[in-house]
Amino acid sequence: MIGRIAGVLLEKNPPHLLIDCNGVGYEVDVPMSTFYNLPGTGEKVVLLTQMIVREDAHLLYGFLTPQERSTFRELLKITGIGARMALAVLSGMSVQELSQTVTMQDAARLTRVPGIGKKTAERLLLELKGKLGADLGAMAGAASQSDHASDILNALLALGYSEKEGLAAIKNVPAGTGVSEGIKLALKALSKA
C-alpha cells in the first residue's frame, strides 16, 4: 500500500493531481478541501494517501491532514458509500463540519452534498454516530496543540514514524511553536517513549 506521497506537483485539474516522484508521475484524486490548500504547480507537495485496488484500476486518494484521511476511511466502511461518494462528502464540507453534522444529526445538511439523498444521509448519520466524533476529537485536539502541527507530523512521517506515534508526539509541542522547534520537541518526546 502507498500511505504517503511526496514530490513535485506537475498538474492540478480538480479533483485530479499529477505528482512527480523521482521521475514517476502518480495520479492522485483529492477532496476540494485539500485541493484549495495545495501549493502551485512546480512546487513540492506531501500528501497522506489511501490506495484502493479494484479489478480494473489502482486508485490513489490524497489528503493534507490525518483527520481527512481517517474520515475518508470511516466513510468507506459504510455500505453504499464508495470512494467517489466519500470524496464528494469531504469536498462538500470540512471534517469539523461533518463531525458537527453527525453530532447534531442534521440530515438536511448532508443532502446538500451532490449525490447524497435523504436515505443515504440518514444511513451516514446512523453509521458515523459515535465513531467520527471521538476519533476526530482526539486527533483534532492533538493537532491543534501547535499552529504547525501538520508540518511537524509530515516531517515525522518522512522520518519513518507512524501516524499514531506522530500524533502522540505532537501533544508535547506547545501551541505557537515554530516548525523546526516543534520537530525537535516531538523527536525528544519520541526518544523518551
From Swiss-Prot:
Residue ranges of the region described as Flexible linker: 139-143
Chain residue ranges for the region called Domain II: 65-139
Region of interest (Domain III), ranges: 144-193
Subcellular location: Cytoplasm
Keywords: Cytoplasm, DNA damage, DNA recombination, DNA repair, DNA-binding
Gene Ontology MF terms: ATP binding; four-way junction DNA binding; four-way junction helicase activity
Chief localization: cytoplasm
GO cellular component, one term: cytoplasm
InterPro entries assigned to the protein according to its UniProt record, in alphabetical order: DNA_helicase_Holl-junc_RuvA_I (IPR013849), Hlx-hairpin-Hlx_DNA-bd_motif (IPR003583), NA-bd_OB-fold (IPR012340), RuvA (IPR000085), RuvA_2-like (IPR010994), RuvA_C (IPR011114), RuvA_C_sf (IPR036267)
One of the GO BP terms on file: DNA repair
UniProt region (Domain I), positions on chain: 1-64
Domain of life: Bacteria
Domain observations: Has three domains with a flexible linker between the domains II and III and assumes an 'L' shape. Domain III is highly mobile and contacts RuvB.
Function in brief: The RuvA-RuvB-RuvC complex processes Holliday junction (HJ) DNA during genetic recombination and DNA repair, while the RuvA-RuvB complex plays an important role in the rescue of blocked DNA replication forks via replication fork reversal (RFR). RuvA specifically binds to HJ cruciform DNA, conferring on it an open structure. The RuvB hexamer acts as an ATP-dependent pump, pulling dsDNA into and through the RuvAB complex. HJ branch migration allows RuvC to scan DNA until it finds its consensus sequence, where it cleaves and resolves the cruciform DNA.
Family the UniProt entry places it in: Belongs to the RuvA family.
Oligomer status and interactors: Homotetramer. Forms an RuvA(8)-RuvB(12)-Holliday junction (HJ) complex. HJ DNA is sandwiched between 2 RuvA tetramers; dsDNA enters through RuvA and exits via RuvB. An RuvB hexamer assembles on each DNA strand where it exits the tetramer. Each RuvB hexamer is contacted by two RuvA subunits (via domain III) on 2 adjacent RuvB subunits; this complex drives branch migration. In the full resolvosome a probable DNA-RuvA(4)-RuvB(12)-RuvC(2) complex forms which resolves the HJ.
UniProt protein name: Holliday junction branch migration complex subunit RuvA
Species whose genome carries this gene: Paraburkholderia phymatum (strain DSM 17167 / CIP 108236 / LMG 21445 / STM815)
